Amino acid sequence: MSRRVRRGGLRVAVPKQETPVSKFLTASGTFQDDDIKLNHTGLRVVSSEPNLPTQTQSSSPDGQLSIADLELVRFLGKGAGGTVQLVRHKWTNVNYALKAIQMNINETVRKQIVQELKINQVTHQQCPYIVECFHSFYHNGVISMILEYMDRGSLSDIIKQQKQIPEPYLAVIASQVLKGLEYLHQVRHIIHRDIKPSNLLINHKGEVKISDFGVSAVLVHSLAQRDTFVGTCTYMSPERLQGRSYAYDSDLWSLGLTLLECALGTFPYKPAGMEEGWQNFFILMECIVNQPPAAASPDKFSPEFCSFIESCIRKCPSERPSTTDLLKHPFLQKYNEEEYHLSKIL
């Protein structure tokens, strides 16, 4: 079940409340959790994490962007704890994606939302390969994020429409995603931890951007590692599935699987006779951990593409190249981005 909250003429649909949010509210009605403070005017981060600003106040472009100035166009989708709607700014006719999260949700989802808020804040206007969050605020039990609208959907949508994405366009996609990951890894020391087709969004200009930072992690320094188990299991690297420590290179495994899925039109790992159900889910996980890595067939793909995928999907994390090294890979140099502009397949 869900309820609808009317906000300045805009009806925001949010999931049904499950747990009290009152313990996260200050006397003034500000939502406070961990090191963020969020109210109707915006977001403030007071962070002890070395790669996040000590104090930051979110602001809308030119002070013009507010919930009262947005009108609903249509419903886009829903996920854990929230809904996403396409909205239009009444005065500029610019479209945005409005993500609304009811904060009376379970602790795991709440922590993911808080983490997403912090990372959205630190990456604001910093990297053209990351979906931008223009404004976020809290009001009446709902956290709202006004996000850049990517009007061609996700790579997952493209696969459903096209079945397979031709290799030259995959090179263009890989280049843009790697530039986004290079920024996250080397500048912000962030592991995304959930790279997959549905989290890579595209717009009509052919721009590919990374989205959804709910399960991302900030590392203390470039050599640090994590050992928590979050993200979409089917795209996890073997070391993560085994519960071992992991670092930035786990994102590259996920990217390799994602690109191979786009090339094949189906998920690369699919044991014979696989059917839906938990038993077969664990068989799939065992296959990823214990069997040789998935690979691009040299009979169907160029040597450069096969080499690129092999570089990403190496079971030993230390053998995977960095984002910087992969950006120099012959596969990305083989195709001209202008000639294979993504708008041609959208």
Swiss-Prot record:
<dbReference type="GO" id="GO:0004674">
    <property type="term" value="F:protein serine/threonine kinase activity"/>
</dbReference>
<protein>
    <recommendedName>
        <fullName>Mitogen-activated protein kinase kinase 1c</fullName>
        <ecNumber>2.7.12.2</ecNumber>
    </recommendedName>
</protein>
<dbReference type="GO" id="GO:0005737">
    <property type="term" value="C:cytoplasm"/>
</dbReference>
<dbReference type="InterPro" id="IPR011009">
    <property type="entry name" value="Kinase-like_dom_sf"/>
</dbReference>
<dbReference type="InterPro" id="IPR000719">
    <property type="entry name" value="Prot_kinase_dom"/>
</dbReference>
<dbReference type="GO" id="GO:0010200">
    <property type="term" value="P:response to chitin"/>
</dbReference>
<comment type="function">
    <text>The CERK1, MEKK1a/b, MKK1a/b/c and MPK4a/b proteins are involved in pathogen defense. The pathway induces rapid growth inhibition, cell wall depositions and accumulation of defense-related transcripts. This protein is required for full defense response to fungal pathogen chitin.</text>
</comment>
<feature type="binding site">
    <location>
        <begin position="76"/>
        <end position="84"/>
    </location>
    <ligand>
        <name>ATP</name>
    </ligand>
</feature>
<keyword id="KW-0547">Nucleotide-binding</keyword>
<dbReference type="InterPro" id="IPR008271">
    <property type="entry name" value="Ser/Thr_kinase_AS"/>
</dbReference>
<dbReference type="GO" id="GO:0004708">
    <property type="term" value="F:MAP kinase kinase activity"/>
</dbReference>
<keyword id="KW-0723">Serine/threonine-protein kinase</keyword>
<dbReference type="Pfam" id="PF00069">
    <property type="entry name" value="Pkinase"/>
</dbReference>
<feature type="binding site">
    <location>
        <position position="99"/>
    </location>
    <ligand>
        <name>ATP</name>
    </ligand>
</feature>
<keyword id="KW-0067">ATP-binding</keyword>
<keyword id="KW-0418">Kinase</keyword>
<comment type="similarity">
    <text>Belongs to the protein kinase superfamily. STE Ser/Thr protein kinase family. MAP kinase kinase subfamily.</text>
</comment>
<keyword id="KW-0611">Plant defense</keyword>
<dbReference type="InterPro" id="IPR017441">
    <property type="entry name" value="Protein_kinase_ATP_BS"/>
</dbReference>
<dbReference type="GO" id="GO:0004713">
    <property type="term" value="F:protein tyrosine kinase activity"/>
</dbReference>
<keyword id="KW-0808">Transferase</keyword>
<feature type="active site" description="Proton acceptor">
    <location>
        <position position="194"/>
    </location>
</feature>
<dbReference type="GO" id="GO:0106310">
    <property type="term" value="F:protein serine kinase activity"/>
</dbReference>
<dbReference type="GO" id="GO:0005524">
    <property type="term" value="F:ATP binding"/>
</dbReference>
<feature type="domain" description="Protein kinase">
    <location>
        <begin position="70"/>
        <end position="332"/>
    </location>
</feature>
<dbReference type="GO" id="GO:0006952">
    <property type="term" value="P:defense response"/>
</dbReference>
